[in-house]
Structures are given as C-alpha cells and as structure tokens.
UniProtKB/Swiss-Prot annotation:
CDD domains assigned to the protein according to its UniProt record, in alphabetical order: Frataxin (cd00503)
HAMAP family registered for this protein in UniProt: CyaY
PANTHER family referenced in this protein's UniProt entry, alphabetically: FRATAXIN (PTHR16821), FRATAXIN, MITOCHONDRIAL (PTHR16821:SF2)
Name listed for the protein in its UniProt record: Iron-sulfur cluster assembly protein CyaY
C-alpha cells in the first residue's frame, strides 16, 4: 500500500465513524471532531477516544481509557497487531464503556 492509498482508506474510516455518530440516537451526547488526520470522540462524561493515522507505519492507532491499540490493514479489516481483534470491535467496546450505553458503528 502506498501513502495515497493509506490516506484514502483512513479518510474513509474517519467518514464512516463520523456518519455513524451523526446518526446515533442514544441517550448520551457524543461529539466527533477531525483535525489534521486525528479523529477525537468526546463523551458526555468528558472522556475521549483518539484515533490517528501513523503514516510511516501505515497503521491506525486507537487510544481509549482502556489502553492503546495499533492496527494493520489485513484484507478489508484493520486488525490489532497484538490481540488480533478488529478495529470496529475494539472501538465499539471502548465507546460503549465510555458512553455508559451500547454504541455501534456497524
């Protein structure tokens, strides 16, 4: 994968997250902001999830209250380089915990 393809894939990932949060109708207030390739999700309780791209490594990094995760693209999925879990699974787990209610991105 070259840098332009990596940017296209991560831009698509960011847009998907933003669209899902815009459509979300849960009880909690969840805000999403994209700035300089960094996506920040802010929850009503003040906690945050930070997602950014690591261009030199062609990885997506996810920082949550539970810890940090690094994802490599394998086929069509971003997969954690330690646990083997998918990006969407770990993001949903963290968002659900930090929002205090179920949050789905799929």
């Amino acid at each position: 994968m070259n840098d332009s393809e990596f940017h296209r894939l991560t831009d698509t990932l960011w847009m998907t997250i933003e669209e899902r949060l815009d459509d979300w109708d849960g009880d909690s207030d969840i805000d999403c902001e994209i700035n300089g390739g960094v996506l920040t999700i802010t929850f009503e309780n003040g906690s945050k999830i930070i997602i950014n791209r690591q261009e030199p490594l062609h990885q997506v990094w996810l920082a949550t209250k539970q810890g940090g995760y690094h994802f490599d693209l394998k086929g069509d999925e971003w997969i954690c380089d330690r646990s083997g879990e998918t990006f969407w699974d770990l993001l949903e787990q963290a968002a659900t915990q930090q929002a205090g209610e179920a949050v789905s991105f799929r």
